[in-house]
Amino acid sequence: MGTIISNKTPQETLRLINNIPFFKSFSSAEKQEFAELSNQVIEYSDKTAIVEEGQTDMAVFILLKGEAIVTRNDLPKVTINTLTIGALFGEVSFLTQTPRTTNIFAKSRAKVLKLDHKMFEKLKPETREKLKDNFINVLVNRMSDMNTALVRLKVEMEAISQAAVDYQEEFDRILK
């Protein structure tokens, strides 16, 4: 479990937000509105779970310091992804109100900004929509990355399959 560092002042939160690419498209007024709402900065030690698969906590997180790794319970030794400063995670559960589908562990000492639904409900509708649009952009980019990886994997699998056929044909030729 992480340690809550503090509830940051609006000025401290604004400084953090200004350094995060996710918030680059927001105006100064929108960033200020966001910074004035309650949020938490939480620190996690090395190898500590930030998010656990199956959890029903519906917050979204932004990595402020350190690195984190993504895993799944069915593949515990496989690192699906490594998250770096500025990474957004937890947005799927936040948007769909469904349990977490992955684990996120601090790879090193990490700080995250945790944002919950109560905070989002206090935002002006335009700011809230912009946040949702940014979430969608993150999801679209991830989907594009997954499609690229899937195509690469398919090409590799076809090459392996063809190599197996070629090998079998050569093996059969030698045995004749």
Predicted regions and their residues:
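Cytosolic regulatory regions built on CNB/CRP/Popeye-like sensor folds
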Residues: 1-176
